[in-house]
Design a protein with these regions (language model features):
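Glycine- and acidic-residue-rich phosphate-binding/metal-coordinating active-site segment common to enzymes
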Residues: 113-115, 119-174
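Short, surface-exposed loop and linker segments with low hydrophobicity and enrichment for Pro/Ser/Thr
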Residues: 12-19, 78-80, 142-153
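Extracellular or lumenal secretory-pathway regions
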Residues: 15-115, 119, 132-133, 164-263
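Bacterial Sec-dependent N-terminal signal peptides
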Residues: 1-21
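A sequence-composition feature that detects small, non-aromatic residues
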Residues: 7-9, 13, 65, 123-126, ...
Length: 263
């Protein structure tokens, strides 16, 4: 990624189409290790509908490649017209929708600096058990930013927590013909989602075995291949349990302190 484009677009301003903001995230997945991971994200902003969609795009193009395992799978949808905001959390292969409120308790300071030739101003906030420092620019008049951060008088160019566990930086701005298309999801409130994550971590293969038993009940056949070998349902369950628990040992520093991190 050494030649990753730092593209600057000067808006003069007729926002008649969608705009895609590419962010680089550098974060510490493990609280007991200083090693960092690097991943890339798209914030697709629909200028007509005033809504946005944030998701991981690591590996989709050569410039967005990463040597580490992708760990940050949370997607975020924001609809500023209707004041609707929600996270789409991935638990195994399914997405679960969890609403959150618009962020409006920023503390704006007098500090400023230039980022990508745009003048930005500093703002601070406490969120998810962390203290964050953001840099935003009113030159791009969208009250949006990476992850669930929003509510400032301009686009967030950078935001980092004060312990340097997570750091988002805007690296590219693109005109886009893409449309916002959300994955299928199930709605859960915050408490129920946390319970589901904890239950899944305790026994990751339980839902898989339930689905297999349902297929058997419907006389549906199935086979699973792992490492080019056919494996039975018991081996499949053991492999899934091992994979999820090993992932959780490495990825134990979620962006929201106290959350359970699942792939």
């Amino acid at each position: 990624f050494l030649f990753f484009f730092l593209t600057v677009v000067f808006f003069q301003v007729s926002f008649g189409q969608n705009i895609e903001f590419i962010y680089e995230l550098v974060y510490r997945p493990n609280v007991d290790d200083e090693k960092t991971n690097k991943e890339y994200f798209s914030l697709l902003y629909d200028t007509d509908q005033q809504q946005s969609y944030f998701k991981n795009i690591t590996g989709l193009e050569e410039n967005w490649a990463s040597k580490n395992e992708i760990g940050f799978n949370t997607q975020v949808f924001k609809n500023f017209k209707e004041n609707k905001f929600y996270l789409l959390d991935k638990v195994l292969s399914k997405f679960y929708k969890n609403d959150f409120k618009k962020i409006n308790n920023w503390m704006i300071t007098n500090d400023s600096k230039y980022i990508l030739n745009h003048k930005t101003y500093q703002a601070k906030i406490a969120s998810g058990g962390r203290n964050w420092v953001a840099w935003y620019s009113a030159e791009i008049p969208f009250a949006d930013g990476p992850y669930k951060f929003n509510g400032l008088p301009g686009l967030i160019f950078e935001i980092t927590d004060t312990e340097n566990n997570y750091s988002f930086k805007l690296v590219q701005i693109l005109k886009s013909n893409k449309n916002i298309i959300l994955p299928n999801y199930t709605s859960l409130n915050d408490d129920d989602l946390k319970k589901l994550k904890k239950k899944t971590l305790e026994n990751p293969s339980s839902n898989l075995m339930l689905a297999i038993n349902q297929m058997k009940g419907n006389n549906m056949g199935f086979s699973v291949t792992f490492d080019n070998k056919n494996i039975d349902e018991k081996e499949m369950a053991e492999q899934l349990d091992k994979e999820i628990k090993e992932f959780n040992k490495t990825f134990n520093n979620p962006i929201e302190i106290g959350d359970v991190w699942l792939k």
